[in-house]
Each structure stands twice: as C-alpha cells, then as structure tokens.
C-alpha cells in the first residue's frame, strides 16, 4: 500500500512536472511558449524503460505463441511493429524545435506502439478535428503510460482524492485545464480553446495510483502552426467525404513522406491503379490546401512517377497511364466514386451487380430488415392517444389491431390536426330542458314551482360557439330559419345582466342602480334553489350602523348553508337552461325593485350598486384570509342579489378614531360616518411588526388620502401599550421583544422596510429602538456590543444559521457545513484551505453593523471567525468562458478580443480483463 501512495510535496512547485509519454517529452520555459523542444526515442528504448519498471517476478517471463498447424512444435515468428525512420535524439533536440505538426506526428507514431495501441480503441476516424484529436490522444496516452511508473511528488495530489456527489456516477475524478490557440484561416482572428482533461477511476479506488499522471498541456501555436492546422482541417474534411480506397493514401503520404517508398513497400499490386488515379487528382487539382498538404508531406509540389520507366511491360504501363489520365479528368469527383481496381474491371458497383443477379431469378429472395435502418414511422408505443385507444379496443387479436391501425389516419410529424368532432348526445324528449353543454346522461331535474313549468315548449338548443347575446337566446326569437319555441311572456324594459352592470359604468363614476320595469306576473316567492349560489360557504358581509342607533354596532351571525347538489352545474349564465334563466331574471328584478323602493339612509349592506373603492389587494396581504374584499368580489361576479343585510361577529379591541377609519373597512364599504370619541370601539388584528410614522411596512401599500393625520397608536400590534389620549402628530416610543443577536443601527432602518413618502413631523430615531438598547439623543449611528446587553443571547441550534430576519450578516465555517477535510496518509490535516472572504449584505451603501463573533471551532482548536462577503456591488466578476459567435459565412466573427471555447474530455480508465496490462499490481499486506 505504501508503494502506491504519493510522496511528500516537492519543495519547489514553480517547475511543473510533465511525465514522459512514450517518446514525447514537453519542456516549456515559463516565459517562452514558442520554443518548446521534443524528444523522440525509438521503440527499443521504450521497451527497455518499461522492463526496468516491471517487478522482478515478471521479468523474463514472456509468452510464446504456438503454431496450431505445426502441432505446437514450432513457435510462430513474431512480427515487430513498423519502425519509423527518425534521426537521432541529439539531432532532433538541437535542430528541430517542437511545433504542433511534429507533435501530432508523434501521436501517430505512438498509435503503432504496442503499449499505446489502446488509443485506437477509444477513437478513430470519427474525430476530424485536429485539436480534439490531440487532446484525447495525449490524455489517454499519458494515463496508460504513467500508471506503470512511480507517482510524482506533486502537492496537488493531496486534493485529487475527490468523489462526486451524484448517486448515478460513483467516480473519483480530477480535472486539469489548459488553453491553446485554435487552427483557423490566417484572415480570421485566432480563437482560444480551453482544454480540460479529466481522469477517473471506478468508485474512486486507488486514486493515488490512477491520478499520479500529469495532464497534457499543449504548446502555444505559432502563425505557421495555425496555418498548418487549417490545412489539416480542410484535408480532414475531404478525407471524411472520400471513398476509403482513396482516403488511405492521404495517411500514407503523411506518415511515409515519399511516393517511391509508398509504391514499392506499402501499396499492393491491386491498389496501384487506384493509387495512379489518386496521383492524377493531385497533379491537376486547384485546391490550395491540397497543394499545401502535398508540400508539407513531400517537401515539393511536383508529383513524379519514376516507376513508370522501370516497367517495360506494355499492358501494365497502359493500365497505369489510363488510371493517371482518369484522375486528371475527373478531379475531386473521382474521390467520391467507386474505383476501378483492375484492368478489365467494369464500372458497375457491387449493388448494381447484385441487382442484375436478382433480376434473373423468378422467386422472391428473403429480405433481412435491419433495426438500425431509417424509421419511416414511429413505433406503436409512440402512437397518439387516439391510436392507442383504438388498438386497446380492438381486443386480443393481432389481426384486428393491425387493421385498426391501418385504418387510422397517418400524418407526418408536425402537421396540424383537425379538431375532433365530439358526437352530440341525444336529449330525451321527456325532459323539457335543453342545455348547451351536451352531456351523455341527463339526470332528472329537481322539482320546481308551478310558475316555472313551461307547457308545450319544444327543445331549443342554444348556440355555443360563438355565444349569442342573452336576448337572442330567449325562446320565441327565431334565428336563421330555425323553429321557434313556444311563446312566453316577454320582459318589459331593457334586459340588464348583473355580471355586465359594472362594464356599463365609467371607470371614474360610481355604480348607478338599474331599475327595470315590473313584470306582468304575480309576485311569487322564489326558492333559493333557483339562484346560482356558490357551492362552498361564501364569506360573510360586514355592516355598520350610523351613530343614531342605540347600540354602537349590531352583531349578528348567519350560517351559510351549502347549496343543494345539482348535477353538472352551468359554468356561465349563457350555458344555463331557459327555465333557470327566466327564474333568475325574475328574482333579480324583484330584488332590484325592492331595493329601489326601500333606500336606507346609512350604509347597511354591501351590494353591487354600492360604490366600492380600489385597490382591494392590501387587505388581502395584511390579513390572510380576510373576507373584506371577497364579499364585494362574490357579490359583483356571481350576481347574487342582496336580499337582506348580512352581518357577522368581529371582535374589536382598538378604537376607530374620528380622524382615520379602518383601512380594510374603508376600502371595501365606502365612506364611513364619523364615530364619536366618547365611545371608543376596539378591534383586534394580530400584527407582527409595528408600523410607525418614520417608515411604513413593505406590505402596506399607499392608501387614499384620509381625513386627519395618521396616528401611530392605531396600528399597534397585540401586546403593546395603548395611548390614553389620541393626539394627532404625536408618536410615542414603541418596543417589542424579538430574539436578536445583533443590534440594528439607528441611522439605517431595517432592510425589509421600503421607502415611503415624507410625512408631517420629523423622523424620530427612537421609533426603531429595541429592547435592551439605550436611546440616543441624536440621529448619529450608535454601535452597541453584545456584552452591554442585559439579556442572554438565544441558544443557537447550529452555528452559522440566523435566528431572526434582522440579522444581516452570516458566519460560515468548514465545520458548520460539514465539508470534508482532506487528510494525508500520516493522519495530519493538510492546510490547503484558503481564507474565507467577507459576505456583505448591505443594501445601497448603508453601513453594516459589526457582526458578533460566534465561537466556531476551526482546525487546530482555533476559532474560525472570518466574515464572508455577500455583496454583489463592486466585486470582481469571475472568469466565465465565452462561446464563439459565427458569422453568416460560417466562420468566426473577427473581434479585437480573442474568443474562448470550453472543450472538456472525460477519460474513464477501465480496469478489467480487456486491458490486463493496465491493472494495478496487487496490494501488499
């Protein structure tokens, strides 16, 4: 176990260690990023270095392959990997500085090495982006190579023991970031690419061994390197779109760098005609990046074929010359077609030849359908709800389900669907009602008064879309040639809907009562079932009497009974039946006539005809569940006539003085007559904060101007001392008890109090005094320490958690949040934590009081009392990556500032039977 653990941190951390990566070693000075050197060694030295790190028990034990054909007697000859011709280490070290093109060539050479061949299993030709290829290759390559070596002594390894909090990915990981310039056209500004390589292991095990490898840090690109990367990108796009028989020649040219060597040693006899076509394309191409690629690979732009003169055979030379001419003639189009691999080969493809063979057979050949093909329609599980219902109703038979699915209309995805016409149910003739909301089952209507019975009246359906006016929907009015219903007595006078009475009034005027003409029928008491009463118990109404009554306030209580259950109640007056509408109109007419004849002198009830003041929202915010504004809304929207005055019991414990009536009563019931001061009346409303003259609470909105000055004693909360005399303009000091751990300054009010318009009289700072704080003589800011307070502090349940909204500073520590503390292997805690910053919760520059130091034990038995700064004004913005903006031509928009792109790669090191050489050595007991 001790061998797998990292050593102590290095004393000098300025020199960052980058482990060797199979022949590629990066040396970067701190000030010069352009001159970076490379060391390339042959594969023999690499194998010797690996054997040196193997354990003694593993040395000298190499498995030998047995030839099956020879019966196990003769071992098979091991074919070594192809060796690349590179000059000596000293020549490359002093003659060739590391540029990105040689760096990528080293990666290509590493792919042929036995130990680094696993790179091909992670990615192949799918990545045409050069910088992504570099990042992925070097991250995986270093992880494979460095897991066999001793862990480097780096201080950052202490922080590498991390585990994600996600339940679905129990991985240990370490991310390392760097940046480089991207490849681009010379006319476009270079883009900065942020590279991030993340190394991880399963379940966070053996993290020190897995994370002991360094991370690839690419060198900064020079202008020549960016030009070369641009060429490689364009050539890579061409290779991806070319036929595989031609695209392999691009790799041969980039690796071997000689046409003669490719012709003699690499290309097979069957590929020579195709290779000649490829050379013909290179001779006549006009693409600039293809010419640059040939120049980088061969060192010249001329394409020569010296092997043509060495072969005197006439037939072979003619075939090669014909292929060269075809490449010149077709150009780039030749790379996208199927090549001719022989002299007598035809131009038809494999698919065409298979079609010609199948045409000769009369019998139909079996066809195998692949599941990976293009889906022309969605699977049955993704069918629409209508189709699924049809399939479910079809029964268990598969044939019936298929027939039902075939009959279902097929539409492409995204096309609008026509509205589904619902079948209109048949209304039985026995019922004399007709509703506009057709239902499948019409229950028996409740018993009604004989006056409401309409004899010999045919069913009259009311139009639902669009909704016609109420006058057009009444029976006896023919429309569009439809049969008229039986004649009924017409109403005299205009028809006024109660829910539209408020719309007829101007916004600045009060409601004008509408009194229709009396109906030519005998007044019959209308039962309550004919009215549209709310199902839930409606809130009570408030009524006050004038000063002439013998008793101050008359209190009564009415119990609201829920309306009897009616099947499928109408949603709006236009959807009611004709009988219910007629009964409702008669009841409303009688109610209005009764209210016009008997007009009270004082305010006795709340009705839609009474003027109501706005806004009603403040009362709802001040008193949760307050019924003041709901009464007017219910009376106005539902159109229920006010038959009798409604009262309810409201205990009052505070006087409503002559100068300022109660805000909720005034907002919902209009003007209130003055109340004599000799008979004080009280009401009790639970409040949690005082509303003083200096600053009103945030949830009290400005009301309409009230008669007389505002007296602070009227808004005293429960438990406060009441003033014996009511004097306008005099405000007394008010105190309340809250468990606070920090005083509030006199010079700055609390944060949750909003600014109000100036009021009469100077603002007294003593209005915001708290218990235990001595009053000040002036308006200066006074600081009070906790030691001077006479009451004990509140016991904190958890350090760092405020106990009152008045506390405007918070204190956090590592122990308060339960953060994990890194410990090294010796059991001592590593002092890698940075000091905490101060959190400033001040608003608009107001002074922040000194925070008390809560005794929070930190590391080493010391108190962690640093204050965290939470202010958002004037703080430096964190560095956030910016995404590049592409113009209309598809290229990046040119800016003076370089753009940034975040590129992240996650490399998961798998330790299983597939990579036995990657597994860690067994732990020693």
From Swiss-Prot:
Its main location: host cell. It holds the Pfam family EBV-NA3. Signal peptide: none annotated. GO terms for biological process: viral process. Residues 1-88, 337-376, 394-454, 561-581, 873-898 are annotated as: Disordered. Residues 351-364 have a biased composition (Acidic residues). Interacts with human UCKL1. Interacts with host CTPB1; this interaction seems important for EBNA3-mediated transcriptional repression. Interacts with host RBPJ. Interacts with host USP12 and WDR48; these interactions form a deubiquitination-competent complex. This is Epstein-Barr nuclear antigen 3. It comes from Epstein-Barr virus (strain AG876). The lineage of its organism: Viruses, Duplodnaviria, Heunggongvirae, Peploviricota, Herviviricetes. The gene is EBNA3.
